[in-house]
Amino acid sequence: MASKATQGSIKEIQGDLFDAPDGAALIHACNCIGSWGGGIAKAFKQKYPAAYNIYHSHCQKYKFSPEYLVTSDPPNQPNNAQSSTRNKEIQLPEGTALIIPPQEKDYKDKDKKHWIICLFTSRNYGKRVSPPDVIIRNTELAVADMVRQIHRLRAEESGIGELWSCRFNSGLFGVEWVLSKRVLEESGLDFVVVRPVDEDE
């Protein structure tokens, strides 16, 4: 039976991302260096240390055995007749998503299990964070990769539940939320986006 494409939706609420229901997947943006040292990533590391170890090992794997994603960068200035499609090499895991299943060490003393989804949108962090245009391009690639993986996981009845997200990229990466939100809106999936109660719309 052929599946019909559905339009995704985003519901924005105020609260605590970590209050997501049992089985939910929590989405945040990550650097490719293996550090969850600041912002909401630091809270992820404290609450899900086993998931952090998987993320860190994933980054280290590509550090010592580099692999590259070849992607085309289509012209986005229609008034520029000289623009042409160019191929770009991106060093993994940049531009991809890592979906980490609930880890027993992270949920054994809690009443809820959470999946963790890492979107690799910046190569580095701090003063070496990627420029906003690169982060958004990586976000497009990473979200597309996440969507492919989620469709596969749901087909396998893996138990992955609702998709909950922070306003990723808008904190320490310094990218306006509206730009990342647009990428989610075009993904075809449904998301609950949580912002802290003290954060303005």
Swiss-Prot record:
Annotated function: Highly specific phosphatase involved in the metabolism of ADP-ribose 1''-phosphate (Appr1p) which is produced as a consequence of tRNA splicing.
GO biological process: peptidyl-glutamate ADP-deribosylation
InterPro entries: ADP-ribose_metab_enzymes, Macro_dom, Macro_dom-like
Domain Macro span(s) in chain numbering: 1-201
Identification of the protein by name: ADP-ribose 1''-phosphate phosphatase
Record gene name: poa1
One of the Pfam families matching this protein, by short name: Macro
The keyword Hydrolase is assigned to this record: yes
Sections of the chain in a coiled coil: none
Reactions catalysed, as given in the entry: ADP-alpha-D-ribose 1''-phosphate + H2O = ADP-D-ribose + phosphate
The organism of origin for this protein: Aspergillus oryzae (strain ATCC 42149 / RIB 40) (Yellow koji mold)
EC nos: 3.1.3.84
Molecular function via GO: phosphoprotein phosphatase activity
